[in-house]
Each structure stands twice: as C-alpha cells, then as structure tokens.
Amino acid sequence: MITDRQLSILNAILEDYVDFGQPVGSKTLIERHNLNVSPATIRNEMKQLEDLNYIEKAHSSSGRSPSQLGFRYYVNRLLEQTSHQKTNKLRRLNQLLVENQYDVSSALTYFADELSNISQYTTLVVHPNHKQDIINNVHLIRANPNLVIMVIVFSSGHVEHVHLASDIPFSNDKLNTISNFVTNKLTEFNQNLQDDIVSFVQSEQEEIFINKLINTMNNHISNQSNSIYMGGKVKLIDALNESNVSSIQPILQYIESNRIAELLQDISSPNINVKIGNEIDDSLSDISIVTSQYHFDETLKGQIAVIGPTAMHYQNVIQLLNRIW
C-alpha cells in the first residue's frame, strides 16, 4: 500500500515519462508539477517507490522511470475509476456500415483506420463471429461468364460478398433459381441436403457448382470470423524509440500472426482489458495492448485492440474505448 503523496509522485513520474520519453528526476518533478515539498522529501519518496518496484533507476541518469509493476498499478486505478463512469456511446460503426452498403469488411477497415487516427496508436479490429448470426438470403450475380459474385445477407442486415469461379456460364435465370434453392435450404444444412441437391439439379455441372457454392460460403464465414483489420501499422514502429528497435520485428510478427487472434479470443470481454509487456508474451516487454468490445447490434459483436508502447497514454485510450458501443 502506498501513501497519497507517493501515489501523486508515481502518477507524475509516469505521466512525464509517457509525455517526454525520458527518466524523471526530483528537480524536474518539482518544477513541472509545483509540488510543495523539498527535493529531499521527493528523493526519499522516490526511494520508497523504487524499493516497492513501482519505479526503477535508469543506468545513465539520476532520474527514474516507471516499471511494469508501476504501469500496472496506474492502469488498475484508471480502470477502477472509469468502470462506473457513464459515457455517451459512439455508434460510428453503424454509420460506416450504411456508408459502405453494409459491407462489413469495408466498414471494419475504415473503422480500424479511424480509431488509429484518433488514438494515434496501431489499432486492430477483429471481424465479428457470423456463426452467431443467421443467413437470410443468398443472391448470385454473374460478373462475367466464369465469375459469379455471391452476396450473403445476414439477419442482422450485414452483407458479405464472395467471388465464386464457375466452369460454365450459367444464365441469370438459372442463377436466380439456384439462389432461391440455396436460400430455402439454409436451415436444412444436414445429412439430407445432398439428396435435395441431387433431386434439384438438372446436370452434374449444376451439382458441382452448388456444392462448391455451399463449401465456399461456409469456409468464408469461418475464415472471416478470424479476420483482423489493422489501422496505423506505422504508428507502432514510430512509437518504439531507438533504444528498442531490436524488438520491432518480433512485435510485428506477433500482431500479424494467429497468436494475436488467440490472445484477443482469450480475453474476449465486454469490459476494457489492459495487457502490459510480459503479461502478453515474454518477448513483448516493450508494448501494451488495450482491448474492448464493439457492437453491430445486441447479438453481433467483435473485439478492438489498441497497441502501443508500454509508455502509452492509457487514460486517453481507455476513455476512447469506453465510448464505443
């Protein structure tokens, strides 16, 4: 347990370190924060905080910087303070859906970029799990003799577009007939479906095409549920200073791999969650990940992650994610 004065000093050290990227000394603290105590008192309190492992001494400076434990203490207090706050929720994602004709992938791409521009950090947005949604309609549109565009319409109103190669140039009337058949059978995808297909088709080519359509649709929905949209990738590189350039490559490999998707699934929660440094992975001591949920509606939701250095403006990021519905 630390005293109120030690807490004020810890907050001041942490905020200065985040703002300026340099270890903070007692003289600097007094000048910047108008602390009404002597430098000796500040140094003594800093020594106590160092003994508690909340701050650590820089090798080439007399100043102190926050430790991972110090960041964790600060973040826990922030989360506790904001958990009871009522905020006006932003429904920007719903606007983006309308602007992009309910194309979820396009909307999430713009959403990731917008969040990155607002937060000034790299942002990941995970595609919602459509397995929780219901397919209402399937429309087939012939783009050219050998390409069909499959438009999947979900009960939530969201739309997915899938390209489907075709060995034969089906007429628009035939594609409409196939669309109606598949739509009517959506709730019957079971062991009887293949018999229904055989009874419906008029040629082996039709049977092959419909089976391919169904497999492609199922694979697309499954794959999309794991898709991640990244905004502001370069911001993470810029945020990591020269002292930890060597850590950039493993960090980029991590966020571009399935491991980040697994992490986001593991901490899937309606509440804001913060992972700092080694809490993420032993090789990722230089970054933090702040996660939260976003909603399309009451049932369809996904995960957002904001990624930055451990010296992140946590308060700004938490306030931003707190406003997203």
Curated annotation (Swiss-Prot):
One of the GO BP terms on file: negative regulation of DNA-templated transcription
Residues of the signal peptide: none
Protein origin, superkingdom: Bacteria
Molecular-function annotations in GO: DNA binding
Alphabetic keyword roster: Repressor, Stress response, Transcription, Transcription regulation
InterPro entries: GAF-like_dom_sf, HrcA, HrcA_C, WH-like_DNA-bd_sf, WH_DNA-bd_sf, WHTH_transcript_rep_HrcA_IDD
Family: Belongs to the HrcA family.
Annotated HAMAP family: HrcA
Functional note: Negative regulator of class I heat shock genes (grpE-dnaK-dnaJ and groELS operons). Prevents heat-shock induction of these operons.
Name of the protein in its database record: Heat-inducible transcription repressor HrcA
Source organism of the structure: Staphylococcus aureus (strain bovine RF122 / ET3-1)
